[in-house]
Each structure stands twice: as structure tokens, then as C-alpha cells.
UniProtKB/Swiss-Prot annotation:
Belongs to the PanD family. The modification Pyruvic acid (Ser) is found at S25. Pfam families: Asp_decarbox. GO terms for cellular component: cytosol. Gene3D superfamilies: 2.40.40.20. This is Aspartate 1-decarboxylase.
Amino acid sequence: MIRTMLQGKLHRVKVTQADLHYEGSCAIDQDFLEAAGILEYEAIDIYNVDNGQRFSTYAIAAERGSRIISVNGAAARCACVGDKLIICSYVQMSDAAARLHHPKVAYFEGENQLQRKAKAVPVQVA
């Protein structure tokens, strides 16, 4: 059996740019990509916390240290500057590997300041 698992997650990053006429993708600060283990050109799913939009694209690297999150091309219709996003990548693996797997999660606040990194999503309490 093959399972699809969360590989990396950027939690609550803020959109800094939206460029409808760029050829596509989502530009992400290289430091952020590394924090979540996301590779340039890797497929990503984006969840807009502010408007509920969910869409797929691919990651490209933005300048290291820039704190840029730029939603480009047609996806720019799904997010505005200032919107909070959750950006995820996924990996497929065997059932046995999935049971040992831990994602790389990076949490952000304010103007895209990395607050902490984790290897799991916290258990939701009642």
C-alpha cells in the first residue's frame, strides 16, 4: 500500500506579492523552503486562511532572507497581499515508512517571521 503523507508545511505565512501576469507558481523565500523541506519546482497545495480558497501550483525560490511569498499567474486570483496562507507539500511512501514519518512544519507570525519548527502537527484538544 502507498500512502500520501504531509512532507512539509509553512503555517500562516503572509502574502507579500500577487502578480497575475507572472508565468505562474509561488515564489517563496529560500530560507522558508529549507525550513519545510520543500524543493524548488516541487508541487505544493496552498490553503488561504482568509478566503477559504484551496489551489495547487509549484514552488520557486525567492531571494534568501527576503520573507517573500508571491502568488503568481492565475493563482494570484486566489490570494491578495496580506492574506495568510498554509503551504503544504506531500510525499508518497510505503505504509511501513509512513508509520515512521514526521513532516517538517514551520510556523510563522507577523511579517513572515519564523517562530518555530516542528516535526509534527499538535494534537487538537477538545
